Amino acid sequence: ASPIPEVNISIPQFTVVPLTKGWLQVKGDFAIGRSFDRHTIEQFANEKETYVYDILWHHKSLALQVKDTRHGFPLSARIGVNHWAQWGGTSTNPKIGVQPHSFKDLLRVIGGRSGGDNATFADQDNVLGAHYGTYDFKLTYTHDKGSLTAYHQHYFNDLSGMVFENGTDGLWGGELTINGLSWLKKVVVEYVNTRDQSGPFHFIWFDHEKHPGVGGGGDDYYNNGEYRTGFTYANQAIGSPLLISPAHNDNGDITFRHNRIRDWHFAAEGALSTHLSYRLLFTKMNS
């Protein structure tokens, strides 16, 4: 997808945390933005579709890295979290209309809290807006002859995913970098699974203080019942390209129709001579 117009405050590179003797580094960002893709959606959506336009966005991330910046210890570890949220805007569904968009509502979105009395029933029952996120884990071993990295990105759309009820869903990968071998410099293997989704259907727990119902299951990644365009900008997916963007639907459907996948990705690169290098990419999709 194209970048969402936003104001972003960030620590873009890992920066050493004081008093940690160089062992702990941090980076992150905080952003507020707005969609300007109404015309694109209007031109694409079929006449039965309803959607929210002029959507407001919030994004934040935080990553911590434990690494010997003096390069005396070969192992490094990284953990992080990414959070995106859609809120505000106006729905073409007259029963929904203008969505809450005050500063107080922004604070609710930032904190992942439920909506106020002017929010829809669903947003009062769950959280205000549509939320998407990942947990990131990475472990790297570095040697004079190269490096070996294992990493995992865990997906979540709601609380059930945040507490890992969606099992092993996410991206699992490994990367091998080889020094001193020109014809094969790097190999990457990745596996993406989104088939669990906290179960095959949405379930309800009858223990909410204000309304009878809160639950999970049937996470339906990148889709949302009210923000029908889902995790997209200008009809293109913001997250994994393996979850096919609504722009490729042939019937004006603005949702992700194929979001239960189990795919493999392989890549390799190197140089065959001083003037000839190569990169091979192969993806096996099973959705």
Language model features with spans:
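Long alpha-helical, hydrophobic tracts
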Residues: 1-41, 45-52
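Flexible, solvent-exposed coil segments and beta strand-coil junctions
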Residues: 1, 31-34, 40-45, 114-120, ...
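Outer-membrane beta-barrel pore domains
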Residues: 122-287
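Short loop/turn motifs that connect adjacent beta-strands in outer-membrane beta-barrel proteins
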Residues: 14-28, 65-78, 141-147, 178-184, ...
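A conserved mid-domain beta-alpha-beta active-site/ligand-binding segment of alpha/beta enzyme cores
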Residues: 52, 56-60, 64-139
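Outer-membrane beta-barrel translocator domains and adjoining extracellular loop/strand segments
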Residues: 38-48, 90-94, 161-165, 199-204
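Sequence/structural signature of outer-membrane beta-barrel proteins
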Residues: 1, 16, 33-40, 44, ...
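Extended hydrophobic secondary-structure segments that form protein cores and membrane-embedded regions
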Residues: 25-34, 77-82, 154, 187-192
